[in-house]
Amino acid sequence: MKFVLLFGVLLVTLFSYSSAEMLDDFDQADEDELLSLIEKEEARAKECTPRFCDCSHDRHSCCRSELFKDVCTCFYPEGGDNEVCTCQQPKHLKYMEKAADKAKKFGGKIKKWFG
């Protein structure tokens, strides 16, 4: 049992270390291209609809979060006949972003420990 646990920990450590190295290689190779994409994204961000604001005028205008684009969700308030639409982030995408952030932080700690 101890061997299986030790092997599992070693496997997870090696996987996170190798994925951190691949991310570093990706960052160095495409730095110029990434900067141009960020500039375009900043220019486009001025036109998007922020989270929890009305998006009924353009249902595809919601802003992006760190990884995913927000979704225009429409509903009828209780006792009302008018449809209300707001930009919202689905819960499953919110949890995926949190998990990706924690994985990035953990990969950085592993890299710091092993040089």
Swiss-Prot record:
Protein origin, superkingdom: Eukaryota
Tissue expression pattern: Expressed by the venom gland.
Record GO terms (molecular function): toxin activity
Major localization listed first in the record, in broad terms: secreted
Maturation-removed propeptide residues: 21-44
Signal peptide: 1-20
Keyword presence, Membrane: no
Localization annotation: Secreted
UniProt keyword list: Disulfide bond, Knottin, Secreted, Signal, Toxin
GO cellular component: extracellular region
Cysteines joined through disulfide linkages: C48-C63, C55-C72, C62-C87, C74-C85
Family label: Belongs to the neurotoxin 19 (CSTX) family. 01 subfamily.
Domain free text: The presence of a 'disulfide through disulfide knot' structurally defines this protein as a knottin.
This protein's name: U3-lycotoxin-Ls1c
Species of origin: Lycosa singoriensis
